[in-house]
């Protein structure tokens, strides 16, 4: 327990708390700004009881004098960071490169959880211009997680749609001639869930079949077209395989489940974006979801001292090819860095091209040089990165006419 005298003394100086993060148990220690050990390393669990133990150790000191640091390691520290920020502590997430440098300077080449707490605390103490995690940063963490989960969900859905097409080709190949817009629409899913084989479609009552198509296509299909579909079903050469028919029904149910999950994910992203009211939403053609994916991946714009660093982070910078005296004049984008950010930026760039004359002129100029659509779009995405960097850095609205 810290005496009142020592508490008053420590409140006059900064206290640096280093936390070594792990999956189940964390270690923490604290030093003063003159290097004195205030709290010996102690273990606490990665749960509510453990977090309370940490707080109880820090309660003896003035909250405003405490600076808490931890390394950016996977996701194990995310809950602790959220908890501490919510409790209004000053929290700094350190780049492991910084702590690695401090570890190398240690005379004793020892690496344990307890030693690492001091290394992290000393790294905090030696840093200038520390940036603390804010509530905005927590929202960006949420956007990043939601955006990446959205991408995974879309990939899952795409695989299921490919499987569904394969199944339908086997049991009812003629259906593709009737639904010219493709299989993946509400009317087709409604039909195949109820009648996943041509035999079942052919035996459906005409009034019911016509009504099912009409309701699920918002009146697009008529009774005459329903008759055409039934004739196709009667003449189908597809396999009458109950196992495949069952897979068709279940695959559609899985696709629809993923559709509903995507709606919820995008609604959450939209709510976060509306609350934060970022200047990125002033860019014509960028919506809440796409804007949210970009912001979530970028996080703190001040991590990037210039737009070229943001370009490299997105993998939109040109790769360099040089051998001896030869250096390639044209190279492809490096495609390193955040794949999700690169996808979001290229997608956003196409929307901006279609909604802004400056970007449209830039795209047309690249096409006039003989570049392909995707090559020109990559250049537009690079231009968009520079615009976004400037907007977020200076917090100014889009102003390119």
Label every model-predicted segment:
Residues 1-401:
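A detector of single, family-specific signature residues
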């Amino acid at each position: 327990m810290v005496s009142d005298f020592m508490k008053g003394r420590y409140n006059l100086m900064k206290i640096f708390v280093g936390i070594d993060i792990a999956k189940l148990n964390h270690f923490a220690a604290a030093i003063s700004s003159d290097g004195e050990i205030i709290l010996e390393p102690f273990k606490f669990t990665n749960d509510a009881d453990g977090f309370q133990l940490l707080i109880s150790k820090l309660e003896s000191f003035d909250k405003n004098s405490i600076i808490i640091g931890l390394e950016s390691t996977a996701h194990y520290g995310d809950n602790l960071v959220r908890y501490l920020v919510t409790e209004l502590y000053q929290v700094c997430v350190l780049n492991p490169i910084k702590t690695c440098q401090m570890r190398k300077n240690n005379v004793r080449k020892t690496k344990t959880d307890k030693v690492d707490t001091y290394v992290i605390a000393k790294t905090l103490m030696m840093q200038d211009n520390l940036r603390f995690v804010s509530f905005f940063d927590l929202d960006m963490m949420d956007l990043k997680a939601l955006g990446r989960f959205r991408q995974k969900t879309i990939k899952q859905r795409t695989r299921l749609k490919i499987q569904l097409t394969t199944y339908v080709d086997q049991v009812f190949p003629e259906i593709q001639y009737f639904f010219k817009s493709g299989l993946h629409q509400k009317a087709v899913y409604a039909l195949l869930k109820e009648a996943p084989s041509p035999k079942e479609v052919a035996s459906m009552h005409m009034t019911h079949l016509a009504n099912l198509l009409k309701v699920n296509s918002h009146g697009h299909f008529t009774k005459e077209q329903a008759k055409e579909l039934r004739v196709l079903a009667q003449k189908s050469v597809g396999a009458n395989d109950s196992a495949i028919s069952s897979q068709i029904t279940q695959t559609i149910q899985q696709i629809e489940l993923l559709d509903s999950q995507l709606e919820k994910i995008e609604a959450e992203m939209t709510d976060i974006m509306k609350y934060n009211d970022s200047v990125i939403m002033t860019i014509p053609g960028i919506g809440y979801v796409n804007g949210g994916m970009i912001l979530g991946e970028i996080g703190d714009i001040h991590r990037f001292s210039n737009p070229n660093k943001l370009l490299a982070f997105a993998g939109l910078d040109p790769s360099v090819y040089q051998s001896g005296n030869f250096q390639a004049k044209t190279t492809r984008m490096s495609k390193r860095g955040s794949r999700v950010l690169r996808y979001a930026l290229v997608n956003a760039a196409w929307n901006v091209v279609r909604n802004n004359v400056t970007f449209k002129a830039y795209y047309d100029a690249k096409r006039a040089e003989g570049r392909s659509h995707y090559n020109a779009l990559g250049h537009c995405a690079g231009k968009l990165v520079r615009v976004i960097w400037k907007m977020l850095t200076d917090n100014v609205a889009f102003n390119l006419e």
